[in-house]
A protein has these predicted regions:
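Gly/Ser/Thr/Pro-enriched helix-cap/hinge segments flanking short amphipathic alpha-helices
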Residues: 1-70, 103
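Repeat-based blade/solenoid architectures
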Residues: 42-70, 111-125, 150, 171-183, ...
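A generic tandem-repeat structural signature
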Residues: 114-161, 165
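Hydrophobic beta-strand segments that make up the repeating blades of beta-propeller
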Residues: 83-88, 136-140, 195-199
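Short glycine/acidic-enriched loop and turn motifs that connect beta-strands
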Residues: 90-93, 142-146, 201-205
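Beta-propeller fold detector
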Residues: 34-40, 105-111, 166-170
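Beta-propeller blade repeat segments, especially FG-GAP/WD-type strand-to-loop junctions
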Residues: 93-107, 147-168, 207-217
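Beta-propeller blade termini
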Residues: 67-78, 119-130, 158, 171, ...
């Protein structure tokens, strides 16, 4: 309904007949070729724990234990197909999916179970040992335990070249901080990728400035 030139200095009462009203739905432009197409990936559902940060820290603006999962992609078995890593949460192990001609298939990595209590808040693939395949960095984070807990351990998994990964223990000291971001970079230009880890927060001590770290490879 359009009212042309309504009189001024008057009260106009407009009554809509709701019995005949229809919502306005604009017609979407039809294209011969869609830009995106849905693909059934058959990935396992992510599961969060029931921890509530506000019970411990009442002054935080949002929960710092629900910032995952983080993922990463790389061709880990040299078949020219991108494979997929999805980080886990407290109580759920991380998952690795190998891409094939029929889609993605879950690859069993037993060492992922060792840190199933960690919230994965950063991850990326890189060639850590310079053997020509893609290894995996996983950042430990969250806010479900005090800073002294080992759930904040950052992890390095070495690739056997066929899609199997083994935890390289002792690669990083426990940072005791909530990992916010991790970036591979060759800061000293020696041909090896080093790692910068930016901390988001001190676990369960919101407001305290956390330390960040630079690891030399």
């Amino acid at each position: 309904t359009t009212i042309q030139k309504p009189a001024i200095n008057q009260l106009h009462k407009i009554v809509y007949d709701l019995s005949t009203a229809k919502p306005h739905v604009p017609n979407a432009e039809k294209t011969e070729t869609a830009l995106f197409q849905e693909i059934a990936l058959q990935l396992n559902k992510h599961s969060e724990d029931d921890h509530v940060d506000f019970y411990v820290e009442r002054n935080i603006p949002f929960m710092l234990s629900k910032l995952g999962p983080k993922g990463a992609t790389a061709d880990i078995n040299k078949d020219e197909l991108e494979d997929l890593f999805i980080g886990g949460a407290n109580g759920q192990a991380s998952q690795l999916y190998i891409q094939g001609s029929n889609g993605f298939k879950l690859q069993q990595i037993p060492d992922f179970e060792k840190y199933k209590f960690t919230d994965v808040t950063a991850s990326f693939f890189f060639d850590a040992d310079q053997d020509g395949d893609q290894d995996l960095f996983v950042g430990g984070g969250g806010n479900t335990a005090p800073a002294a807990s080992d759930i904040y351990q950052n992890q390095l998994y070495l690739n056997d070249g066929k899609g199997g990964f083994t935890l390289k223990s002792g690669s990083f000291l426990i940072s005791h901080t909530n990992c916010g971001i991790a970036i591979p970079l060759d800061y000293d230009k020696d041909g090896k990728l080093d790692i910068f880890i930016g901390s988001r927060s001190e676990p369960q001590q919101y407001g305290i400035a956390p330390k960040s770290f630079l690891y030399h490879n």
